[in-house]
């Protein structure tokens, strides 16, 4: 897509004058999102959300169901990126105790195949979910992860059928999430 990127993200510790990758695991990260208190950073790797806790130098896996062309956590599908110009659907509460995110189930969205040139002499194929007019879109749901209890809860959105959630943000009250 045009706006999303994958990269190796680095953390620079000013006090120790030390630079290291935000994750020791293989794979690049997407949409690093720092907590308001600066002690954590949430990011997406392989369609799953992870949190790096800087104070303890640990990495916590928030979601485990992410899968290419099926489930996206925290990042957006093609429609949201192209039509709403949004790639990040994760938000920290003001007290840094909760991480809200949108989950996309694109398993019923038809696949589109496109030729892509890479390192080889001939192009390969890139397959991704692309709903044409009249086809099914991703099913979206909003979730909240507690950093303290490590529980994830699905939040009930009072809308039925096909709908979009292009923005989420916590209000100044850490118990209120605005879903737009």
Predicted feature residues:
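Beta-propeller folds
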Residues: 1-180
